[in-house]
């Protein structure tokens, strides 16, 4: 879900999501109150957090599940590269979360460029101090999932989308507004989008 979308769109999307009784929700650009509303319906919800200040604010507001998604991700991209973001956020969590009971309730998912054994090992290394503190850690490997058989078989994406991703060897960042950019395959659509943006 896009937490920064217009209120009616968020409401409508949330109602559709609830009708499918998902086990998990990822909320990009969301707020703790949005996560709490889904959690009240039994949907485990994670908030994307692109900066240490937001992480601290969200912890103070009672949020406990976060996605730390660096700029190397597909889809919506944040302002910081993965390693810079992850290092900063791990330091913030270690400085903020001192109580073991609180630590045990916090879940962190690392995302943005995690695609093979080496990148997963890098996450394991940077996340080790959090795990030692009792914070639960994991990874989102969205790009790896994009290339799987299951993503098409389950209807999460259509084969044409996957084929475009498989054929892609370069990407572009399409900015739809201040602070809102998405990574996309270099394509006629991306070329038209960028040309129109230049015209405006």
What are these regions (language model features)?
Residues 1-102:
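Active-site entrance/lid segments in N-terminal catalytic domains of soluble metabolic enzymes
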Residues 67, 111, 140:
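Generic enzyme active-site microenvironment
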């Amino acid at each position: 879900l896009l937490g920064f979308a217009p209120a009616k769109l968020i409401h409508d999307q949330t109602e559709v999501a609830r009708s499918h009784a998902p086990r998990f929700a990822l909320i990009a650009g969301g707020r703790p109150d949005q996560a709490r509303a889904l959690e009240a319906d039994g949907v485990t919800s994670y908030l994307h957090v692109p900066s240490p200040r937001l992480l601290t604010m969200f912890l103070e507001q009672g949020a406990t599940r976060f996605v730390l998604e660096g700029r190397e991700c597909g889809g919506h991209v944040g302002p910081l590269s993965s390693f810079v973001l992850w290092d900063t956020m791990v330091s913030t969590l270690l400085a903020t979360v001192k109580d073991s009971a609180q630590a045990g309730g916090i879940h962190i998912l690392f995302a943005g460029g995690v695609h093979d054994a080496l990148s997963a090992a890098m996450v394991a290394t940077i996340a080790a101090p959090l795990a030692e503190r009792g914070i639960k850690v994991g990874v989102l490997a969205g790009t790896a999932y994009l290339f799987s058989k299951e993503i098409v078989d389950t209807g999460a994406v259509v084969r044409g989308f996957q084929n475009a991703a498989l054929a892609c060897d370069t990407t572009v960042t399409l900015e739809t507004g201040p602070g809102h950019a998405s990574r996309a395959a270099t394509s006629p659509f991306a070329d038209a989008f960028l040309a129109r943006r230049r015209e405006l």
